[in-house]
C-alpha cells in the first residue's frame, strides 16, 4: 500500500459492484484514500450461474484473473447466482477477496425467488432480464437489482454486496486469528 492509499481492483465494470467495494473499504479504512477501479474479468462459468458451486467458482476465477492483470492492494470479485434449495429457489452472491497471498470467500444474503422467475432462468434467461421484463424496468442489474425490486427498495444489490464484503474482510482485519 502506498502511504494512505489503498488500491482496489474489482473484477467487473458494473457500477453497483464497484460502489459496493468502495463503500465497504471506506467504512473499514476511514483513514485511507480508497482508489477503486473496475475491470472486465471473465468468470469462466455460465452468464447466469445456476448452482452454488458455479457461483462461488465464478467469483474466484474473476479475482484470480484480476491478480494476473494489474498490481493492487486488494482484488474483489462478486458473482451473483441462483440455486434451488430445499426451501425453494433463491438468488445470492459470492464475494472473493485477494490480498497478498491470501484469499477470502464470503457470501451475501439469500433472496427467495418466485418460482416463475426461477423457471425463466432454467430456460436460459439471466436474472436481470427476467426482472426487467417482470417489473418493466431497464438494466436493473446495474441499479437496485432483484433485491431492490422484491424488497420494495428496503435492500439493494449494492447493500447486500457491501455487507458481504465487510464480512469477507474479517481475515484481513484480524490476520493473527486466521493463520
From Swiss-Prot:
Reaction(s) the record says it catalyses: XTP + H2O = XDP + phosphate + H(+); ITP + H2O = IDP + phosphate + H(+)
Gene3D superfamilies registered for this protein in UniProt: 3.90.950.10
Residues that bind substrate: 71-72
Pfam families cross-referenced by the UniProt entry: NTPase_I-T
GO aspect biological process, one term: nucleotide metabolic process
Oligomeric and partner information: Homodimer.
Protein family: Belongs to the YjjX NTPase family.
Protein name, UniProt field: Inosine/xanthosine triphosphatase
Lineage: Bacteria, Pseudomonadati, Pseudomonadota, Gammaproteobacteria, Alteromonadales
